[in-house]
Structures are given as C-alpha cells and as structure tokens.
C-alpha cells in the first residue's frame, strides 16, 4: 500500500486467503485490518476469478498430488512447472522431503528464480536436496523443467522428442504436470501428452476440477473489501466481463456504485483532496513490439542483429520430415532475402539444397 494524506492506496496482487499457510506465505489479516482502520482511499483488486463462487482455498493445494507422484514413480520424476509459481515449487520440495531423491533444476532462468527465492526466504529447501547435472542419470532423481505460457511445454517437448542434450527419457521415467494448461494451451497440452504416451511414459496429472491458479475468488474479494473498507474501489486485471463481476461484488458489500471505477487501459484516474475528479483524460496506449521474451525497449544488441541482417541478408532452409519415419516428405526449400537473387543463382541454390539434404539425412 501507499500512504497519502487522504488515506492509503492499496494494490492487491494475485492472492488467495488461506489461514493454514505459514512462513513467507502467511497472510496477516490483522495487519491488513490495521491498514483498513487507518483509512483506505482506493482499493484495487484483480478480477480473474471474480465469477467463481466461494473461496479459492483449499482448491489451490497440490501437495497430496505431488506426494502421490513422488511415492508411486519407479524411476526419475519430471515436473513441468511455471517458474513464478513459487507455492507450487514449494509443494514439490515438500513432497520430496524425507526421501533420498535429489532435485535437479533445468535451465538458467528457473535456477536463478529458485536460488533467489531460497535466498529471500520464499522457498524452504533442505540443504543438499538440490543436485546438479551429474545426478540426472540417477534413477530416483526429481527434475524440474520450466513451462512458458508464451511457448507452452517447449522445454518438456525437447526432452520427450529427444532434442535435449542433458535429459533423455528412460523406460521407468514419469512426468507430472504441476500447473494447469490455460484455455489457449489445451491443444498443445493434448499433443505433448500424446507424445509422452507413445513413449510409454507414466503421466501424473492434477485433476481438471482442481482450481490451482492462485487468484482470488468471489468470497476472497468480498472479504478484502470488508477488511479494507475503502472509499473508492477499482477492479483490475482480467477480461472486462470479470472486472464487471468484480465491481458487482464490491457493490454487494457496501461500496456505492458511483465510487467504483471500471476503467480501460490508458484511462487516468484523478483523486484530488480525497475526492474523485473525472477529467476524462486518456493516455494513448499502443501495442508493444516484443522481441523474443523481452517486452522492454529493443536493445542495442537486437538493433545490431537487425543491422547485420540488413547488410548481409538471410537464407532460410525448410523441409517437411515425417516425425515417425524421419523420411523427407517435401523439400528442402531455400528462401533467400537480401542475399542473392534465386533466379540468377540457380546453381548456388541447388548446391545449398544438396548440402541441406545431406545434413537432414545424417541427423
């Protein structure tokens, strides 16, 4: 929260209310109530689960499913996880406690997040539990593989299809999907699970009726409104219809409709001397050009890469290969941009195709 002379401005991130949590995940409702008693000018809450009835807890708890996977897997156990779901990661480490299994974290990004979370006290991991690459061959190793919402199951797919240089699937391996697939990922989820089944690998999956995303449901949201008792309320985050549902919840627990703001990206909210002033101001919000995984300004290195492409050109080689028989169905085709004119250099293009064909056949 941010304190102002007119009261606190409170921004609630993703959360669930769970009185059984301890340590870094313990929500101190007493402190929140204290902020409310001091006076809250504006409360902003997420809207993603505003249409869901009841509290999110205890549906977000996955420890028993992970414990079952650890106990029943005969060989190595691979978890596909979202890197920023620290509670899910903690549940996995808790499930491994008391066993002789080592946990190997794959990928620098996931390693960095887990190391930082341990250092800051957000993850409680016993000394010696985290192993390294030499433990990958051990039959009882637990392997954490990061899943990316923008490229779902990419890292796991590399392992399943034999492209990962560190991990190759073995007969007794098992794979556990620790996070739910989002609506836009359903087809990708079905595809990767079919590929796993073809390899004869056991799959542990969280039941679909488990609500494991850490978002506040309707009762969570209404309880927070009662605790903070804000003068103004603004739903944020989530589709517009979810924000409308969030606004209705606030109205149900006593916030006047005229004190509830439903705003779109770019709308400016002015509160002067403790009172909302509708100036109708709007900041132009444009789409952001995303380069790779970065949504920040395009850096010098990226610009240099583009300059190099502009100066030297690009050759793209494509071929269609049957993933079962490894036979070439079509191609290879050669696409040249800014390098040579294909129609004037047919001999060069044919030589590139020939070399490409050799490389594909030998790999």
Annotate the PLM regions.
Residues 234-275:
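Anionic-ligand-binding alpha/beta catalytic cores of soluble enzymes and soluble regulatory domains
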Residues 70-77, 97-101, 172-176, 201-205, ...:
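Short, surface-exposed connector motifs at secondary-structure boundaries
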Residues 1-135, 155-165, 187-190:
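His/Asp/Glu-rich metal-coordinating catalytic cores
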Residues 198-216, 220:
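Generic long, charged, amphipathic alpha-helical segments
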Residues 302-363:
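Conserved bacterial/organellar gene-expression machines centered on ribosome-associated P-loop NTPases
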Residues 106-179, 280-302:
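A contiguous, basic/glycine-rich beta-loop/short-helix subdomain that forms a polymer-engagement track
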Residues 40-41, 75, 221-238, 246:
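Proline-aspartate-enriched helix->loop->beta-strand connector
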Residues 165, 169, 180-200, 347:
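Redox- and metal-dependent alpha/beta enzyme cores, enriched for Fe-S-associated oxidoreductases
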């Amino acid at each position: 929260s941010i304190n102002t002379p007119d009261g606190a401005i409170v921004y609630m991130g993703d959360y669930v209310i769970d009185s059984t949590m301890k340590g870094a995940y313990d929500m101190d409702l007493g402190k929140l109530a204290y902020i409310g008693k001091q006076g809250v000018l504006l409360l902003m809450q997420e809207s993603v689960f505003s249409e869901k009835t009841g509290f999110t807890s205890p549906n977000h708890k996955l420890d028993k499913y992970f414990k079952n996977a650890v106990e029943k897997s005969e060989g190595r156990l691979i978890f596909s996880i979202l890197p920023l779901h620290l509670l899910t990661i903690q549940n996995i480490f808790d499930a491994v406690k008391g066993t002789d299994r080592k946990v190997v974290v794959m990928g620098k990004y996931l390693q960095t997040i887990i190391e930082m979370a341990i250092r800051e006290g957000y993850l409680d991991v016993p000394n010696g539990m985290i192993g390294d690459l030499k433990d990958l061959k051990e039959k009882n190793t637990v392997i954490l593989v990061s899943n990316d919402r923008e490229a779902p199951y990419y890292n796991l797919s590399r392992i399943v299809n034999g492209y990962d240089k560190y991990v190759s699937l073995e007969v007794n391996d098992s794979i556990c999907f620790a996070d739910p697939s989002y609506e836009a990922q359903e087809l990708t989820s079905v595809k990767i699970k079919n590929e796993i089944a073809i390899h004869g690998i056991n799959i542990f999956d969280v039941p679909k009726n488990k609500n494991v995303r850490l978002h506040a449901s309707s009762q969570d949201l209404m309880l927070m409104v009662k605790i903070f008792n804000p003068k103004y309320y603004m739903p944020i985050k989530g589709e517009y219809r979810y924000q409308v549902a969030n606004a209705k919840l606030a109205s149900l627990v006593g916030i006047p409709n005229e004190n509830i703001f439903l705003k779109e990206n770019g709308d400016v909210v002015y509160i002067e001397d403790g009172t909302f002033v509708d100036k109708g101001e709007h900041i132009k919000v444009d789409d952001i050009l995303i380069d790779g995984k970065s949504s920040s300004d395009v850096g010098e290195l990226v610009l240099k890469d583009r300059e190099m492409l502009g100066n030297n050109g690009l050759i793209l080689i494509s071929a269609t290969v049957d993933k079962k028989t490894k036979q070439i169905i079509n191609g290879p085709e050669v696409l040249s941009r800014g390098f040579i004119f294909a129609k004037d250099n047919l001999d060069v293009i044919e030589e590139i195709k020939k070399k490409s064909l050799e490389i594909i056949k030998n790999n």
